[in-house]
């Protein structure tokens, strides 16, 4: 029996909630990308060049955000596993009350 078991469900719930929110953010970024591609046809001349530059920066930023979301999600998942493993390994050193 571990003295630290109370936080394991919270870690798992946080990982699940973060995965859902990250999925929603990815979907929103994807929708913004589609809307931008649709709007691109309305730009001409200098406006088109400016739009393409801004769109390229958006795509680069979106890629960075998606990478950070992947890293954060992996870290949350790993935290729960590491916590459980470390807690189980230390369980033998716990003394009774």
Curated annotation (Swiss-Prot):
Gene3D superfamilies recorded: ESAT-6-like (1.10.287.1060)
Pfam family, one: WXG100
Protein's UniProt keywords contain Mitochondrion: no
One Gene Ontology term, aspect cellular component: extracellular region
Keywords: Secreted
Location(s) in or outside the cell: Secreted
Subunit structure: Forms a tight complex with EsxR. Exists in heterodimeric and heterotetrameric forms.
Annotated domain remarks: In the heterotetrameric form, EsxS adopts a long helical conformation that pairs with a second EsxS monomer in an antiparallel manner that allows the N- and C-termini of two EsxS subunits to interact with an EsxR subunit at each end of the EsxS dimer thus creating a molecule with four-helix bundles at its extremities.
Protein name per the record: ESAT-6-like protein EsxS
Organism: Mycobacterium tuberculosis (strain ATCC 25618 / H37Rv)
């Amino acid at each position: 029996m571990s003295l630290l078991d109370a936080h394991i469900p919270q870690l798992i719930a946080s990982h699940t909630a973060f995965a859902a929110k990250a999925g929603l953010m990815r979907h929103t970024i994807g929708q913004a990308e589609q809307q931008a591609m649709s709007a691109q046809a309305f730009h001409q001349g200098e406006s088109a060049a400016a739009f393409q530059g801004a769109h390229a920066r958006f795509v680069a930023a979106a890629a960075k955000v998606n990478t950070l979301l992947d890293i954060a999600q992996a870290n949350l998942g790993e935290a729960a596993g590491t916590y459980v493993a470390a807690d189980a390994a230390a369980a033998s050193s716990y003394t009774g009350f």
